[in-house]
Amino acid sequence: TETCVQYIENADLICYLDFNSPSRTGLMHNDLQHFSNIPKILIDHHREADLSQFVASLSEIETSSTSELVAEIVMNFGFEDYLDDVIATCILVGIMTDTGCFSHSIYGNNTFDICSKLVSNNVDYPLIHNKIYNTFSENKLRLLGYCLNKMTVLDEYHAAIISLSKQELEM
């Protein structure tokens, strides 16, 4: 965190992205509190944003993701020259993961319009999708196997129950 603190000390502006309260910055929260002289802005899509520490905010709950809001800023305020394949990929990953690969939190065509523009910017959508949704760590596979082993099938209801205790989740 020392490197982060050095960057923050030299910042002209701190941008908080994708959370509704500064306390959600975790370990950095205390460090960030020491920089009350640096203006802060919030860009977010969650409900009940705590705006008390920000000089400005863009908080739209009927937007798929904060990444979509960032894309709108980039595309609508003259920053498209900075939208290279790396930045476009990061924005697309944010939209994909916040929407469960476009299965929820879509409030209209805008999300798809933005993603279309991102993909046309040399973004390798199949590769990104594969890395996010088809690549599993050993721990994730072991957890899946453990869960499937604990599954109780209720044939008469065409349903199944998988449950984990808090202790099991922390293993």
PLM region spans:
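Hydrophobic helix-and-loop "lid/oligomerization" segment in the mid-to-C-terminal part
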Residues: 1, 10, 96-171
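N-terminal small/polar loop signature for handling phosphorylated ligands or for N-terminal nucleophile
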Residues: 1-34
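Structural motif
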Residues: 15-16, 41, 159-163
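Short glycine-rich anion-binding loops that position phosphate/pyrophosphate groups of nucleotides
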Residues: 19-22, 46-48, 166-168
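Short helix/loop capping segments that flank catalytic or ligand/cofactor-binding pockets
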Residues: 24-25, 51, 104, 170
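A short helix->loop->beta-strand "cap" motif at the edges of active sites that frequently abuts
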Residues: 35-40
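Short alpha-helices
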Residues: 45-114
